[in-house]
Amino acid sequence: MAPTEATRGGPADPAPAPEAHRGGHTEHADPAEHAAQFGAQERILTLVWGYISSEILDLATRLDLPDLMGTEERAAAELAASLDTDPVATLRLLRAFAALGLAEETGAGRFRLTPAGHRLRTDVPDSLHAFVRQGMGVFRQAWSHFDHSIRTGEPAFDQVFGTDFFSYLSERPELSGTFTSSMREATRTMSTALAKEEEYDFSSYGTVVDIGGADGSLLAAVLSAHPGVEGVVFDSPEGARDAAATLDAAGVGERGRVETGDFFTRVPGGGDLYVLKSILHDWSDARSADILRTVRAAMPAHARLLVVEVLLPDTVDSSAHPLGYLSDLYMLVNMGGRERSERDLRSLLSDTGFRTTRVRTPPGLTPFSLIEAAPV
C-alpha cells in the first residue's frame, strides 16, 4: 500500500502540538504543556522500543564488537571490515550503541567505548559479557508466555520448555557454564566489597558456609580478606564445578573446601556463619521456606545467617528505581521466584525458625541489603 499523508513517516513521528481555539483564532498550547506531552510520548516510545536496546546488546556481544573496539578509537568502516558487515549498517549500529551510552562518536564515523561499554568486553575484571549472553538466551524465550505468569502466578519458563529452569540447566553443561559465568560476573565486584570488614565483620566467625556458592567467588573474597577464617562452598555438582579452582587461584584453597548436594534436603553442619546470597529470590515463598528450614536444621545454636538480597520498598513511588521491579518479574517468569521487601523477608525468616537481628543497606553494596538472623 502506498503511504498516505497520514501514514508517511511511520508511527514514531511526533504528534502535532495541541492547539487551543479562542475567538475563532488557533493558538499554540502553552510551551510547558507541549513539552510535558512530548516528554510523555518520548517515554512511552522508549519503553515500546526497549526490546531494540536489548537486541543491540545481544548483537554487539555475539559479534564481540566491544572486544574488537578494545581501548582504542576505531573507525566504523574498519570495524565493518573486521566483522564482515555492511559498513553503512555498522555505522548506524554504532551510533545507536553510542546513543545508549555504551560508546561515543569522537569524530565523523569514529568511536570508542565508554566505561559502561568496556564492561561488555570479555577481557576486563568487571565484565558483564556473559550476563548479557545468558539474559538474551533461554531466559528471553519465556517472555513469549509472559501472560501465563501473570494469569497463574507460575513461571512461564516451565510451560515453554516443559521443565523448570534449573532442571533444564543441569542437562545442558554449556548453558550451565554460561549461567555460572554470568553469576560470577554479576557477583565479583559485590563480593570484594562485601568481604571488606567495614561492610560486614566476617573475621568474628571461624567457619563461613556459602550456600549456593557456585564457583566460590564470594567465599574466595571473604577468605582472602580474613586470613583467620575457614569456609565451605556448597552447591550442586554442576554449580560448584569450578569452586575448587577459584579457591586455589585466590590462594585460599587450604582454608576452603567444596561440598556438593541439594540445599532442599541438607547443607553442611557445624558452621558459624551461613550465607545465602541471591538465592532466595530464585524461589517461591514455599520453596524459600524449605531452604531456610534446611539451613536452620544444620546450624548450631550460636551460628548466624546472613541473607544478601535486593530489598524492595513496601510501596513503589516516583523515586523507586525500576531495576528491582524488573528483576521481580524476571524471577517470576523464569524461575517462579521473587524480589522481596524487608517485611517479606522478616516474615519468611520468622516462619522458619529465625529471628532477624539486623538489616543494613551499606552504600558500598547498593542495591543489595544485608539481613542477619539468629536461630530461635
Swiss-Prot record:
Keyword Transcription regulation among UniProt keywords: no
Species: Streptomyces alboniger
Residues bound to S-adenosyl-L-methionine: 235, 261-263
GO-annotated molecular function: O-demethylpuromycin O-methyltransferase activity; O-methyltransferase activity; protein dimerization activity
Catalytic activity: O-demethylpuromycin + S-adenosyl-L-methionine = puromycin + S-adenosyl-L-homocysteine + H(+)
Lineage of source species: Bacteria, Bacillati, Actinomycetota, Actinomycetes, Kitasatosporales
GO biological process, one term: methylation
Record family assignment: Belongs to the class I-like SAM-binding methyltransferase superfamily. Cation-independent O-methyltransferase family.
Active site: 281
Enzyme Commission code(s) on record: 2.1.1.38
Ranges annotated as biased composition (Basic and acidic residues): 19-28
Protein name, per record: O-demethylpuromycin-O-methyltransferase
Chain segments carrying region Disordered: 1-28
SUPFAM superfamilies to which the protein is assigned, alphabetical: S-adenosyl-L-methionine-dependent methyltransferases, Winged helix' DNA-binding domain
Keywords, comma-separated and alphabetical: Methyltransferase, S-adenosyl-L-methionine, Transferase
InterPro entries, A to Z: COMT-like, O_MeTrfase_dom, Plant_O-MeTrfase_dimerisation, SAM-dependent_MTases_sf, WH-like_DNA-bd_sf, WH_DNA-bd_sf
